[in-house]
Amino acid sequence: MTTEKEMLDQLRQGKIQLPPLTFSFLDDQLNVGEDERIDAYIDAKWKQKSARFAVECKALSTPKFFQNGINYLKSLPLPKNIFPMLFMPFLSERQLKELEGEGISGIDLCGNCVVVYPGTFSVFRSGGKNRFPSSAAIKNIYRKNSSMVGRGFFVYPDFQTVQDIRATINQRNFLVNLWNKKPMSLSTVSKVLKTMVEDLIITRTETIRLLQP
């Protein structure tokens, strides 16, 4: 797993190469409002044209971090000649298109980007493979035994506690009830819920609630 510092160091040292674009690091950790800061300023150059971007860096490529990055960049009071850019380890083609629709540029460590200087140039690159797969404790929570946690939200879209979810899952698991198989543990349920929050499937506030099926 990479860190934000390591990512910004690569940007600072000119190691982010996304032809036909070239990048020049200008500054980092600057205030842009009363309580807002940006991680870096960079120049993106294409042929003889260049544009300046305010970069928000996220070290995890989860839907939650992606959406948080978009929301933060949209909230910044940037000058008219500085444009927002999200920097993540990996950006999928779908995410690049979403950024483009929001008027936000994006670059990653896998060779993908959408960089837009309105009215001057637009560069879209996709297809670079994800070199930073999920480090979640359970690699795919939507398969095999752990998928029962997600299916539990189709029965009840809102739970008070993790214990309630675990009880619902184990009550509906015929292998537990008929064959005395080991019930799902509380720690497994918690790990699955953590990933579901990062994937923006559920939210955990006062209750644990389904956001989208």
Label each region the model flagged:
Residues 123-151:
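Short alpha-helical segments that sit at the start of domains
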Residues 77-103:
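Nucleic-acid nuclease catalytic cores
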Residues 116-121:
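Short, charged, surface-exposed secondary-structure boundary motifs
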Residues 36-77, 85-86:
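Conserved catalytic cores of phosphodiester-cleaving nucleases, focusing on short active-site segments
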Residues 146-213:
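Loop-centered beta-sheet repeat module
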Residues 103-115:
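Charged, structured surface patches that assemble and position nucleic-acid processing machinery
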Residues 1-31:
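Acidic-basic catalytic patches of nuclease active cores, encompassing PD-(D/E)XK
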